[in-house]
Amino acid sequence: MKVILFANTDWYLYNFRRSLALALQAAGYEVLLLSPPGDYSARLLALGLRWQALQMDRRSVNPLREMVLLLRLVRLFRRERPVLVHNFTVKCAVYGSIAARIARVSARINAVDGLGYVFSSDDRKARLLRPLVRAMLRVALGGRGARLILQNPDDRISFENFGLATAGRVALIPGAGVDCSRFCPRERAATVDAPPTVLLAARLLWEKGLAEYVEAARILRSQGRKVRFLLAGNPDPGNPTAVPEATIRDWVAQGIIEWLGHVDDMATLYASMDIVVLPSFYREGLPTSLIEAAACGLPLITTDMPGCREVVRHEADGLLVPPRDSRALAEAIARLLDSTILRSRLGEAARTKVLAMFDERIVIKRTQEVYRELVPAD
């Protein structure tokens, strides 16, 4: 039984869905991974997975280019003849599902991690695109043999309000999960007089709260606190809310933050951190950086926003602050800096929660259950 996993980058497939692909393969499925080419396709192939390149521009709205993409998908699905296509992100859900319906693929699963720029932004381009994307999503997500996987209850309500979710066809599954054997608490070598370290790991978008993070760092430094503020991630020039690289380098030049760029081994990086923050005011699905940090037993600070509040319960396994409030963020960081007991308690609780809810084995099992609902085993 052949299934296709379709995503907009090979980076996504490798970092978030390789465990699912390997588990499906071990369970007897024939798995084909589909994405544009990138730096991670060789890694997928080295794992013994089958991967195929598909040329697509995840930011394009050119009608001719998009029609070519749709036709490529239809031809590929007709040639490969999968019984199920599993699409990730909004654009892949739209084109993958429409192509699958044309190619008469019997089952379609669309995993959408938040509503994305078109629905969350209020700029002119987003407002113009919204009716078209909504109409395309209605076509893509409808029909027999379709399931929608969402990551949090807020998104479910939003999809229902937009008329995009039908009762009985939505599954709530918490993201891709995390490998809790790899992301786990590690012993740290004691370093005399080493300043505590705070980390923000995210795509470098304004919506992720970068400006608030930098301002919180300024506030705490003005109080005479010796703290290292680290930023991990690369700029995303194609995104309308991307922070310019020149701005990031200016923050570094001012001595406010240290910019690490892309970090491949996040588990090792977390092992040297004291606090992890994500001051996002973006509608997250479920923030992977928070789940990974929680699995490592680190105390978390994030905002009271959809997706974020599913990972952190205030005072129980982390701290929540209002979005776009740099002073509240600074106060929460200061509170954790001043109490090793609180950091330890919240970190331990965060790890316990991840083991119970976000372990990738739980997520993979639930995903396979959705597969079996659509395509019962012979």
Please state what every model-predicted region is.
Residues 14-19, 196, 200, 205-219, ...:
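A conserved mid-protein helix/loop that constitutes part of the nucleotide-sugar donor-binding site
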